[in-house]
From Swiss-Prot:
Disulfide bonds: none
Native source species: Sus scrofa
Glycosylation sites: 81
Biased composition (Basic and acidic residues): 514-528
Chain intervals for the UniProt region annotation (Disordered): 513-543
UniProt KW Repeat keyword: no
Primary localization: membrane
Function: Functions as an organic anion/dicarboxylate exchanger that couples organic anion uptake indirectly to the sodium gradient. Transports organic anions such as estrone 3-sulfate (E1S) and urate in exchange for dicarboxylates such as glutarate or ketoglutarate (2-oxoglutarate). Plays an important role in the excretion of endogenous and exogenous organic anions, especially from the kidney and the brain. E1S transport is pH- and chloride-dependent and may also involve E1S/cGMP exchange.
Gene Ontology molecular-function annotations: antiporter activity; organic anion transmembrane transporter activity; xenobiotic transmembrane transporter activity
Entry keyword Cell membrane: yes
Extracellular side, ranges: 43-124, 173-181, 234-237, 350-355, 410-412, 494-543
Protein name, entry field: Organic anion transporter 3
Amino acid sequence: MTFAELVDRVGSKGPFQLLHTVLLGLPILGMANHNLLQIFTAPTPAHHCRPPPNASAGPWVLPTGLNGKPETCLRFVYPPNASLPNDTRGATEPCLDGWIYNIVDRDSIVTEWDLVCSSSKLKEMAQSVFMAGILVGGLVLGALSDRFGRKPILIFSYLLLGASGSGAAFSPTFSIYAVFRFLCGFSISGISLSTAILNVEWVSTRFRAIKSIAVGFFYTFGQFILPGLAYAIPQWRWLQLTVSVPFLTFFLLSWWLPESIRWMVLSGKSSKALKTLRQVAIFNGKKEEGEKLSLEELKLNLQKEISLAKARHGIADLFRTPVLRRVTLCLSLAWFATGFAYYSLAMGVEEFGVNLYVLQLIFGGVDVPAKFITMLSISYLGRHITEGIVLLLAGGCILALIFVPLDLMTLRTVLAVFGKGCLSGSFSCLFLYTSELYPTVIRQTGMGASNLWARVGSMTAPLVKITGELQPFIPNIIFGTIALLGGSAALFLPETLNRPLPETIEDIETWSLRAKEPKPEPEAEKSSQRIPLQPCEPGPGPS
């Protein structure tokens, strides 16, 4: 009996699983708000230099740019030099007295701390700091999760996100705000890692994909909620606080969640694991089945996993053989390209000149059909074809934005939305594809290393946007080219459709060699080719 069959005995699709999914999914919904929060807490409104004290705002104070609008980062020197001829343009200087912002409906960290002109890089830096927190959190909390358990790390991460998110709302300076945002990203890694493991443990094998997709849709719905919250709460501090406080509630509710049964058995806590299984059986109305379970049966069902856990494998094993080297390098590039390009579009909503709230709803909504189409494609066309196509299409859309004039806002928006949908599909495909390509003995290591590259990409994306100050088209060239390279690399990966999962490193080597061998002609087909033709009996005519 396998562990999945053991879960079936205590109930794998009962009320416990429903409540378990909701309790894990609601924080994921809130996590989407934090990931995309800077879209609404850091928009840059139209602005120009504040005139010097006691000076009128005449044309000699605010120089006019080529577009006929006031310069955003320069003003005329005051008082003007009277010795200059009338046709001479006056000398200019930076905005020494601050800026005037065209604030229509909301404030932001940009308007509060003047993150414009020479300080505009700090806005992108804030998002990179947040992504760096996710990167560091994945490295630190992943290791702590293996040592102390999934549940303690999840509980700690809920508390840390609620506290650090609330702290960011009360930050007196940008530096303190950045520190709290780093901690927010750090805690988000703990939530996503622990949720991914706990989510699929309490269902049978055939329902794992459904439960995984169900929790994934909580993130999509979170993208719908954020624009509504931002529209109702125009003050960035209150918005930051609103999306953070619920995690203090999740912290209290998470004590009800059970620890990973596998982790408890592998950590020598089999008695506690058995007690948890019996509690789940009672909750699902299968008390008698729960009482029949024994410690010996539980250990026997997890004997294989216990043996695999004793074998030590590390990052170096991802490069041990030629096939694994190819898989690791191609997957790393695909993950990096996806995270890199995804956040370039997701965080660039305000660049398309469309209503910020409406466009974010569209950006969130495109994930629904994108994930559905991706699931159909990977089930029929295969994994590497699907992954290659969606990344190539995304790269093409980003590069096409270079050639579309700024006044064609509808076309630019369509390209961006389509590209973002392709990248969302790429994430969905990669999570499944990566788990199928790596053998069981290094699967968790491979997943962690691959996901790390997505975090590096998402952390780098805001910094690349700064190159737009040199030429507006440079960021899109970089984002689009990397996406094309990632899509091309995916095409060199072996196909996993309808193949059993490899258990050992030797399995994937043998598996790859078999894929290169010509398929033998089925015996039934050979026989059918040798069947002699027989005369057909005339059938009955129409009555």
